[in-house]
Amino acid sequence: MEGKLFLGQYLICVILLLGQLHGYKSCIEKERKALLELKAFLIPLNAGEWNDNVLSWTNDTKSDCCQWMGVECNRKSGRITNIAFGIGFIIENPLLNLSLLHPFEDVRSLDLSSSRSCEDCGFSGLFDDVEGYKSLSRLRNLEILDLSSHRFNNSIFPFLNAATSLTTLFLTYNNMHSPFLVKEFKDLTNLEHLDLRGNRFNGSIPTQDYNSLRRFRKLEILDLSDNLFNSRIFPFLNSATSLKSLSLWGNNMGGPFPAKELRDLTNVELLDLSRNRFNGSIPVRALFALRKLKALDLSDNEFSSSVELQGKFAKTKPLSGTCPWKNMEELKLSNNKLAGQFPLCLTSLTGLRVLDLSSNQLTGNVPSALANLESLEYLSLFGNNFEGFFSLGLLANLSKLKVLRLDSQSNSLEVEFETSWKPKFQLVVIALRSCNLEKVPHFLLHQKDLHHVDLSDNQIHGNFPSWLLENNTKLEVLLLQNNSFTSFQLPKSAHNLLFLNVSVNKFNHLFLQNFGWILPHLVCVNLAYNGFQGNLPSSLDNMKSIEFLDLSHNRFHGKLPRRFLKGCYNLTILKLSHNKLSGEVFPEAANFTRLWVMSMDNNLFTGNIGKGFRSLPSLNVLDISNNKLTGVIPSWIGERQGLFALQLSNNMLEGEIPTSLFNISYLQLLDLSSNRLSGDIPPHVSSIYHGAVLLLQNNNLSGVIPDTLLLNVIVLDLRNNRLSGNLPEFINTQNISILLLRGNNFTGQIPHQFCSLSNIQLLDLSNNKFNGSIPSCLSNTSFGLRKGDDSYRYDVPSRFGTAKDPVYFESLLMIDEFNMVNETNSQTKIEFATKHRYDAYMGGNLKLLFGMDLSENELSGEIPVELGGLVELEALNLSHNNLSGVILESFSGLKNVESLDLSFNRLQGPIPLQLTDMISLAVFNVSYNNLSGIVPQGRQFNTFETQSYFGNPLLCGKSIDISCASNNFHPTDNGVEADESTVDMESFYWSFVAAYVTILLGILASLSFDSPWSRAWFYIVDAFVLKVRNMLWQNTAGTKCSYVLVSLSSPSVVVLLKPPALFHKTRT
C-alpha cells in the first residue's frame, strides 16, 4: 500500500515538472540584442571595474539571455522583468541614453546603480533624442528604479516624472541639491518607497508646498537622510499621513524635538532622527501620539535630559515607572548627554527587542528590573558611569538575548556572576569592558554561538582562554587587551578567528611558533606591550589575509624570517618597534606590495638601508629610527612618491642629504636628526609638501639656510649643527609654527620678517651670535593667540579600520557595526628649555606650548616694552646677553608665563612690584645683573630661591635674607632711573687697567731689590688691591666674565683668579 502511494506521488511530481518545462520560454531575441547593445554602450565608459553581470552577456545565439547574470524573465512569456547591470566605475560623467531601455516593454525592475560612490564618477544625466522627457513612459510596467551612486542632479526629475507606474525609486548618493520641489515628480502618485538619502538638499520647503505630499497617498517609506535639511522641513512632512517609515538621520536639524510638527504621522512605525543636533529633553508624552511607533532612533544628538524618562513631569501626573510606548520594539538613545540614573520606565516596555543607551552620562546602579524585558535581543549600556554591583544572573531568563554590551567609564562598576550559573540565552556578542572582572565569566563555557567577545580593560589574570576558540567555531573577534593574562596558549586545531587583540598584558615567555598555523585567517592582530620573547615565527607567512600586525614593545630578537617577508602580501600596517630585532633591514625584495605603514624603530638593526624597500610601492610611513644603521641615505628613497613620513633619526648615517628627498610630493614629516650627516642643506627644496615637519638637528650640517627652505615647512629644527651666516630675509610667515635654530653660528640681527610670524608657537634662536637689539615688533607674533586653531597638526596619522556589519539578528534600525580602528601616529617630538631644563613635548602637549628663547647671543639695548603684550607666552629666556635698561613693568601682563629668565645681562633698577601679578610664574631668574632695591614679596615670589637673585649686591629683602635697614641700601621707587652715584663701570674698567699695568711694571722693576722700603711697598699694594676687590664685588653685576686681582701673603706672588663658576656664561 505504501509503495503504491509513493509511486502515485512520484508520477504527480513528474507531470508537474513536465508541465513547467512545457510552459517555459527562453528570452525574446529582440531583448537579447537590446542587452548586447546596452553592453556595447556601457563597456567603453567603464574604467575596468565591472562585476560579473554584464561580462556574462555573450553574443551567442544559443545562449539564453534569461540565464544571464543580473537578468530575470517571466517563465511563461519569456520577457525580461528584472535587470541588474552591475555598473562599475563610470568615467567622464556621460549621459545615459534612455532609448536603449525601450525594448524591455515588460521590465518591472531596473538596477542601474553604480558599485562605486565617488565625487566625480558615474552618469551625470539622462537623454532621449526621440522621446525626450516622455521616454520612461514607454516602460509601462516599471515599478522599481535604482539610479544610486551617480552624479545625477535635479535635471533628471522631468524624465522620472513620466514613469508613473513606479512604486519604488532609489536616487541615493547623487548630486541633487536644493530646492527640494515635490512638483518635479508630482505624477508619481503610485510611489510607496522614495529614497533620496546622501544628496545635497537643504533648507526648508516653500509654504505653498506644505500639503503637496498628500497626493502621495501610497507613500509608506521616505528616506531623506544624509542631506542638509533643517528643522523647517517638518511642517511639510506632517502632511504625509500614510508614512510608516521616516528617516532623517545625518541632516542639519537642531533645537528641541519637533513633536508638535509630527503629531499627524499616526501611522509611523519607524522614526530615525539620529546624527542631528536636537537638544533638550526627550518628549516621552508628546511621542505618545505616534501610537504605532515600533522603532525610534534619537542617537548621536545633544539630548541632555531624561526627566520624562525618569517618570517626572511638570504639570502632569508622573508615569509611575511606566512608559507609554506599548508597541516599541527598538529604542536607540546612544551618544547623547543623558544624565541621571537609568530610566526605569523603560523596563516596562516588555516588547522591547533593542535597547541602546550607550555613550551617555548615566550614573547609579544598573537596575535589576531589566529582567522584565523578556523580548530583549540587544542590550547596550557601555560608555556610561554606572557603579556598584550588577549580577549577570538577573538576565538569566532573557532567553532571546543575543548582544550584551556593558562597561563603566568611571571604572566603578563590578559585574558579578555565579560559578554554577547557566543562562537560557545563547549570546552572539558579549562586551564587558572596565567591569572589574578578575576572571573570565564561567557561564561563557556554555556559550556555543559567540561571534564577538570583548573583555578588555579588566583585571583578568591566568591563562589565555583558548577554550573560547574551541567552544565557538564561529568566533571572529576576540579582544582581551589591558588585562593581566600571563600564559598565552592556543587550541590544537586551526580556527577561523579574524581579529585578535591581547596587547598590554603580562605575557612573558617564548612566543608560539605555530601561531600562524592555528590562526591562519587573522586580519588584524595586536600583541603589543607584552613580554613575548624569541624569534618571530616563520609560520606568520601562513596568514595570507593579515592586514594589521602589531608586535611592538616586546622582546623579540633575531632576524626577520624570509618566509614572512615573502608570504604576507596583504599586510597594510606592520609595527615591529621597541624589540631587539637585528640584522640588515630588507636586504632583498619583500612581497609587501600593499604595505602603508612600517614601524621598525628602537631595535638593533645594522648595516645600510636595504634595497628591499624599493619593492614597497604603497609605503606611506617608514620609521627605522633609533637603530644602528650606517652608510649613506640612498637617493632612490626619493622615488617613493607616496611617502608621508620618513623617520631615520638616531642612527649613524653619514654623507650628504639627498636632494631627491625634498622632491617627494606628499612628504609631511622628514626626521633625519641625530646622525652624522654633513655638507650643505640641498638648495632646491621648494617642492617640499606644504605644511611639512623637517627635523635635521644634531648633525654636522654646514653652510647657510637655503632661501626656499622656509617656504612650506611648519616645523623646522636645525639645532646643534654648524650652520652660519645671516638668516634668510624672506620667510613665508604664514606657515612656520616652530622654528628652532639653537647652537649654530648664525650672525647678524634678528630679521624683522620674524615680526610677521602669524602662526609661531616656539622660537629658539639661542646660543648663536645674533647682535643688535631685540625687534620691538616681535610683539606682533602670535605665540598662542590662535591656540584654538586646529589647522596645524604635528603628527602624521595613519588609520587602519576594518568594519564588519552585524548580521546577528534582523533590525529595523541601523545597528552599530563592529569597527576595529588602529591609528598609528608618526609623532613630532620637540625638546624645548623651560624651567631650567629640557623637556620633550609631543602630541597634544606640544600644541599647548608657547615659548621664545633668545639667550646666549650678543643682543644689546633695552628690552622692548612691547614684549609684555605676548599674553599667551609660557616661557621667555633672554639670559646671557648684553641687555641694559630696566625690567619691564609690562611683563606683569604675561599671565601665562611659567619661566622667565633675564640673568647675566646688564639690567639695573628695581624689580617691579607688578611682577607679582604673574600668577603662573614658577621659575624666575634675574641673577648677575645690576639690580637694586627691595625684592617683591607675595604670591609666586615667596617660592623663589635666593639663587634667583645672586650677583645683585644692591638687592635686599626678606626673600634673600638681607635687611634693607642698612645704610648701604637705598631702594629706588618703581619707574625712577638708576641711582646717579652708581659707578660708571666702563670708565672704571679702563682706569683700573691703566693703573694695573703701571703698578705691575713698578712691581717687576722692584723685584730685584729686597729692602725694607720694598716690603713696605708690597703692604701698600695689598691694601689697595683689597679695596679694589671689595669695589668689584659691589659693582660688577652684569659682567659676563671677570678676573679679580688677588695678592697673596707672599710679597712676590700676584695671581689672577676667575670668579666662581656661577659667574661664567655657559654654552650648551
Curated annotation (Swiss-Prot):
Topology, Cytoplasmic side: 1008-1068
Localization (cell): Cell membrane
Placement of LRR repeats on the sequence: 104-129, 139-162, 164-187, 188-212, 216-239, 241-264, 265-290, 292-315, 325-349, 350-373, 375-397, 398-423, 424-447, 448-471, 472-497, 499-517, 519-543, 544-567, 569-594, 596-615, 616-639, 641-664, 665-688, 690-710, 711-734, 736-757, 758-781, 846-870, 871-893, 895-918, 920-943
Extracellular domain ranges by topology: 24-986
The keyword Repeat belongs to this UniProt entry's keyword annotation: yes
Transmembrane regions listed in the UniProt entry: 987-1007
This protein's record includes keyword Thylakoid: no
Membrane topology: Single-pass type I membrane protein
Signal peptide start and end residues: 1-23
Glycosylation sites: 59, 97, 153, 202, 279, 397, 471, 482, 501, 570, 591, 663, 700, 735, 745, 771, 780, 822, 877, 882, 925, 930
Main subcellular location of this protein, as a coarse class: membrane
Gene3D superfamilies hit by this protein: Ribonuclease Inhibitor (3.80.10.10)
GO annotation, cellular component aspect: plasma membrane
Keywords per UniProt: Cell membrane, Glycoprotein, Leucine-rich repeat, Membrane, Receptor, Repeat, Signal, Transmembrane, Transmembrane helix
Similarity section: Belongs to the RLP family.
Stated name of the protein: Receptor-like protein 13
